[in-house]
Amino acid sequence: MLSTSQSRSFKNKFRAAFWPVHNYELGKFIPISALMFCILFNQNILRILKDSILISEISAEIAGFAKVYCVTPVAALFVIIYAKMINHLTFEKIFYYLSAFFISCFILFAFVIYPNIHIFHVHPDTLSDWMNKYPHFKWYISLVGNWGYIVYYSLAELWPNIFYVLLFWQFTNELTTTEEAKRFYTLFSLFGNSSLILVGFLMMNLSSEDTIIKKFVSISDSKITLVQVSTTIVAIVAIICCLLVRFISKYIFTNPLFYAKIKKSRSTTQRMGLIKSFKYIAKSKYLWLLLICSAAFGFAINLVEAVWKAKIKELYPTVNTYAEFNSLYILWTGVAIIVMTIIGNNVMRMHNWFVAAVISPVIIMVTGILFFVLIVFDQQILSLFDGAILMSPLALAVSIGGIQNILAKGTKYSIWDTSREMLYIPLDDELKTKGKAAVDVISAKIGKSSSGLVQSIIFTLVPNATFTSISPILMVVFTFVCFAWIYAVRKIYFEYQKIT
């Protein structure tokens, strides 16, 4: 009897640690995991393409301007439109309409605009003359003259915040109780983020000189072929996402076993108007702290990424070589996320919310400072380790920046994302939907655009400045933002305890 009891105890502990999903819950767990996998699959293909196109075709410096003057206004407009849509359309229809809009735009760019970019854009010589004539406004001139790249970049930048952070997690939070979230969310992250590894291998092949595409079609321009094939894959996976949303809406939302408790609470909720809704959100200290946390990540990581991506372009100057390196980085990011998800799953169950949530800002701050120190004091460090470092200063900077970003994204997309989503579960429907839309879409873009604003002001005032030359300033700002993030995490933990 004792042996049987001990065996059951061990089995229960093993299951709780590695597979805390009951068999009857698989009908909910598997479709949601598949949806997350597909959304992140597309997200990372678009991430590789948008950076490879914008930075290789124009420059790394232009990205900050695009985030401030293009991405942020579009994100703000989307939140207003979304708040209107949610009062008149079902979630399912909203997902379909937004998917159709984004995929149509990506297809238009890949098959019409990009192959004929010389028709749609200002001639490079004319653009160069204007930029030389007005050096303080050269980046703004470049924004307008290269509008096709900017629009594509802006839409690809919005994809993660709209389809993953907002729509997917809103959908999932609606279906999941707090008790289920503690067991499911890290596993969602584990399965969903495994898509990064697949995307990494796929895009490395598509962007390489020996791509498998050559076996099926003749390639006249490798970068255009890369974008067109990748966009076709994105469109197919987007259709699969729509089918999964349809399946979940039809078979899970209507199943009392999966949705009865939440459905009952929803029936008593009244919708507020747009103006009243935003006034309600503005009064929430809880959401303001959430906004600071999300904005801080976007701000901090964008400062490091901007310098790192400028170094990548120096080492890999073409669209395809940049994309190939980016694919390798995405692959290892996927590996890091899976490892940290397993660690985070146990941290979240064994410790309180604060311990799990503070891991991300601490790791990002420490690794980010190390990267900036290498950039700012590169010559001193190389002379100190003369002969011991078997690579060029440029290759070393790209490698260290890659490690920093892999660790930062690994902790963010595994531990921090799941910790943040738990904060929405105790909230009422209005804050879960419109509040989440405002925080998740706007805050991330405020963070990135604020970072971009700092960069754009410097590059406007000092036209000849480069990311390397302004790195000391960026390092100081980066450190301050990370400390603010840690402070906000501590404050919101106290608020979270009050309502759970």
Swiss-Prot record:
| Compartment(s) of residence | Cell membrane
Residues spanning the membrane: 26-46, 62-82, 94-114, 149-169, 184-204, 224-244, 287-307, 328-348, 357-377, 381-401, 469-489
**Range of residues in the leader sequence:** none
Q: Name one GO molecular function term.
A: ATP:ADP antiporter activity
Organism superkingdom: Bacteria
Which UniProt keyword terms apply here? ATP-binding, Cell membrane, Membrane, Nucleotide-binding, Transmembrane, Transmembrane helix, Transport
Which Pfam families does this UniProt record tie to the protein?
TLC
Q: How does it sit in the membrane?
A: Multi-pass membrane protein
> What is one cellular component GO term in this UniProt entry?
plasma membrane
Role according to the record:
Provides the rickettsial cell with host ATP in exchange for rickettsial ADP. This is an obligate exchange system. This energy acquiring activity is an important component of rickettsial parasitism.
What's the family?
Answer: Belongs to the ADP/ATP translocase tlc family.
| Protein name as catalogued | ADP,ATP carrier protein 5
Q: Which organism is it from?
A: Rickettsia typhi (strain ATCC VR-144 / Wilmington)
